[in-house]
Amino acid sequence: MSGKRVCPVCGSTEFIYDPSRGEIVCKVCGYVIEENVVDEGPEWRAFDPGQREKRARVGAPESILLHDKGLSTDIGIDRSLTGLMREKMYRLRKWQSRLRVSDAAERNLAFALSELDRLASNLSLPKHVEEEAARLYREAVRKGLIRGRSIEAVIAACVYAACRLLKVPRTLDEIADVSRVDKKEIGRSFRFIARHLNLTPKKLFVKPTDYVNKFADELGLSEKVRRRAIEILEEAYQRGLTSGKSPAGLVAAALYIASLMEGEKRTQREVAEVARVTEVTVRNRYKELVEKLNLKVPIA
């Protein structure tokens, strides 16, 4: 980068711009001429004209989380307007809002995505999971899978599917807790969506170990207990003891066993509450793991 300015150290008029640091530097002596320079160019790089044309855009990027993908334009608000002009602008904004969701399909999609936003917020889901749930829902709409089903149930099912696909541990109970429909309805919609969107058991498989840190955090268990629980679960998996079992129930039992073995005892009730399973489930999985893996567990 060259310009009319002169380096105060060496007198050079040749400079280079460092975009990673936002600095203009003297090419000869390295003196920093200017700091915190804002690069107003695009955030992407292109290596040929075709790539540049493909990546160039005006306005904000598309978002699958918005019913119109963010491609519409909003009428702005000017607080300096008074009287009749302000009323006119208010009416225009109102009509624009109506026209953007002018048919039933658009209204339903807008409602579904607002419900998705609410669920994702309550479940503290990362954005990539929310986007995957939106993609699944749009695909379900495209294939006509929503007809006759509750929008809330289908969007909750898509959230659950996205969590499992991306290995972000959230149980069906957790999702049902923040949804407006019950667990059974979400479960039915999930199985229906999974079948018709080719979400195979292999794709949806969640290793029980994925839940260990989540539950252990809530139980206040040490790293030593977590490692022991993971060892138990990995051995159970290798011996085929996890097939067809609820991951939450297995993790609860493994953490219960590990807490006893490492002297950080938690009760069956405590781990059952955290894992959102019954004490009977914890007890049954506990017996299976201890017997089949021949574990030496101190008497609780």
Swiss-Prot record:
Q: Where does Zn(2+) bind?
A: 7, 10, 26, 29
Q: Where are the sequence repeats?
A: 114-197, 210-291
Identify a single GO molecular function assigned to this protein: TBP-class protein binding
Judging by the UniProt lineage, the source's domain of life is Archaea
The UniProt entry, under Gene3D superfamilies, shows: 1.10.472.170, Cyclin-like
> Which InterPro entries does the record match to this protein?
Cyclin-like_dom, Cyclin-like_sf, TFIIB, TFIIB_arc, TFIIB_CS, TFIIB_cyclin, Znf_TFIIB
Q: Which Pfam families match?
A: TFIIB, Zn_Ribbon_TF
Q: Which GO terms describe its cellular component?
A: transcription preinitiation complex
Matching entries from SMART domains are given as:
CYCLIN
Keyword Disulfide bond listed? The answer is: no
Q: Which GO terms describe its biological process?
A: DNA-templated transcription initiation; transcription preinitiation complex assembly
Q: Where are the zinc fingers (TFIIB-type)?
A: 3-34
The protein's UniProt keywords, in alphabetical order, are: Metal-binding, Repeat, Transcription, Transcription regulation, Zinc, Zinc-finger
Is Zinc-finger one of the keywords?
yes
Q: What does this protein do?
A: Stabilizes TBP binding to an archaeal box-A promoter. Also responsible for recruiting RNA polymerase II to the pre-initiation complex (DNA-TBP-TFIIB).
Please report which protein family the annotation says this sequence is part of. Answer: Belongs to the TFIIB family.
Q: What is this protein called?
A: Transcription initiation factor IIB 1
Question: Native species of this protein?
Answer: Thermococcus kodakarensis (strain ATCC BAA-918 / JCM 12380 / KOD1) (Pyrococcus kodakaraensis (strain KOD1))
The gene for this chain is tfb1
